[in-house]
Amino acid sequence: FRVMPIIDPGVKQDKKYKIYKEGIKKGYFVKNPDGTVYVNKVWPGDAVFPDFGREEVQQWWADNCKYLVDTGTAGIWDDMNEPASFEGEIPDNIVFSDGKYLSTHKKLHNVYGHNMAKATYNGLKKYSHKRPYVITRAAYAGTQKYSTVWTGDNQSLWPHLQMMIPQLCNLGMSGFTFAGTDIGGFGADATAEMLTRWIEAALFSPLYRNHASMGTRAQEPWVFGEPTLSIYRKYLKLRYRFIPFLYDLCYKETKDGLGIMRPLVLNYDQDPAVRTMNDEYMVGDELLVAPVVQEGQNTRAVYLPAGEWIDFWNGVEYAGKRTILVEAPIDKLPLFVKNDTIIPW
């Protein structure tokens, strides 16, 4: 196992807390218009917020990552960094910095999470001497240089499973290739069927992570017993078999900017049949994935674009530019390989 702690920007307002005392002494927290430090409530209770628009505050945050690196953490997960607060939205007129200039929360809100992710990345890079691994909830244009992202607090609902495919494809086309969702849903209670279909549907999402909120049904696969546990294990093993393939696609993305998960219209833009399709996706140019995203469904129609396609599970070949009906029992993800594809295995 590797440990990746969640770190929120909200610093506990506590005169005995070293980080708080340092930040107050150096004037590193965002302020009210009258110059006093702005306070709101988040997970530690009363909390203050680093002014990440200033380079010296980013460096201070980065230096405080050393403790986590020294204790053996494998990465850092930045959360609640819109910034979020428990007692209403942060007012627009709270003073945030934009470099050397004073500005407002209204103007700087969208880049707050970006600057936090950048600071976290630089801290890990400086002290771990390894390729940093950061996850962030809030992001902005360019954050992909510093962090992976996920789509936030979704729900254990079938429409949210359906939403996953266009969300991740759109992120990929926006430069955020390394992205994922909370598999199984974060809020509400997942069912065995929903969790199984979600772990199948997300098989090729770059960030592949089951996550659930406190107070909801536990979502570890063994909680649901069989056959959920065996199916879950099957797809985790399959995921590991595809890691070299996904790694190659990650490298290619750094060169050509094309995402790993892609809408079919990106690869087949002249095909009218795929222009509004949201329940299938491509993995690079080589794989076509057609997940089951409807409750109780054991078959589904799959549209195959131009070319020759091979059923991953049984080797049957199909000509493209047509729709086929495939069997999709609970343990099967409809998956097709483009003919003449070489997959590192």
What do the predicted segments below correspond to?
Residues 1-343:
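Catalytic-domain carbohydrate-binding cleft regions of carbohydrate-active enzymes
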